């Protein structure tokens, strides 16, 4: 678990958030059972490093003037263009009590699908699970390397450890494989050109 030092933030306004970011800081909030919402700011570089280690659904140990808390990352808001972190929401966790969180899906072998002139259509980028904080995985792998057009993958096809309970419907479609529409369209155009040429020659 990554340890981060944060400073309390007094105001929650759009202006104060912009000021915070101009200083190279990211505004955030901690909430949970038995505590009042705690507004804070943290260095952008330190936060980016922590997210690269834990992922965007992992655990963070937060140290502040109020003491230390173990927290779960609930939401990371990013700028849609620059991808810089704009805000982060954290939830206090108690000991090893089970919690629900979303775990990212890592699609393994997608490059082999592309070699088949096919595309992988991803319906989900994460799966909701329930487990103790210490057992939260950084991500789960779904091997799609042997897939062919027409194949579908369900949540049930993803492997989880026995210590993890899947909250989402196991029959939900995670991804499917289909032919590349651009290639199909080009083939149709080529065929029509060939047919028109044959008609003119006849």
UniProtKB/Swiss-Prot annotation:
GO terms for cellular component: cytosolic large ribosomal subunit. GO terms for biological process: translation. CDD domains: Ribosomal_L25_TL5_CTC (cd00495). Disulfide bonds: none annotated. Keywords: Ribonucleoprotein, Ribosomal protein, RNA-binding, rRNA-binding. It comes from the Bacteria. GO terms for molecular function: 5S rRNA binding; structural constituent of ribosome. Transmembrane segments: none annotated. Pfam families: Ribosomal_L25p, Ribosomal_TL5_C. Signal peptide: none annotated. Belongs to the bacterial ribosomal protein bL25 family. CTC subfamily. Part of the 50S ribosomal subunit; part of the 5S rRNA/L5/L18/L25 subcomplex. Contacts the 5S rRNA. Binds to the 5S rRNA independently of L5 and L18. This is one of the proteins that binds to the 5S RNA in the ribosome where it forms part of the central protuberance. This is Large ribosomal subunit protein bL25.
């Amino acid at each position: 678990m990554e340890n981060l030092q944060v400073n309390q933030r007094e105001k929650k306004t759009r202006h104060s958030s912009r000021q915070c970011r101009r200083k190279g800081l990211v505004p955030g909030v901690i909430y949970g059972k038995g505590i009042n919402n705690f507004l804070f700011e943290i260095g952008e570089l330190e936060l980016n490093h922590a997210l690269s280690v834990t992922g965007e659904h992992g655990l963070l140990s937060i140290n502040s003037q109020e003491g230390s808390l173990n927290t779960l990352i609930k939401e990371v808001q990013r700028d849609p263009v620059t991808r810089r972190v704009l805000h982060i929401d954290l939830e206090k966790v108690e000991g090893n009590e089970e919690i629900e969180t979303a775990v990212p899906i890592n699609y393994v072998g997608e490059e082999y699908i592309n070699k088949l002139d096919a595309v992988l259509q991803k319906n989900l980028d994460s799966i909701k699970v329930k487990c103790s904080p210490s057992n939260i995985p950084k991500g789960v792998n779904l091997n799609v390397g042997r897939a062919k057009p027409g194949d579908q993958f369900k949540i049930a096809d993803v492997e989880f450890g026995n210590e993890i309970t899947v909250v989402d419907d196991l029959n939900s479609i995670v991804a499917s494989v289909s032919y590349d529409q651009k290639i199909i369209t080009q083939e149709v155009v080529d065929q029509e050109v060939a047919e028109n040429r044959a008609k003119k020659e006849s």
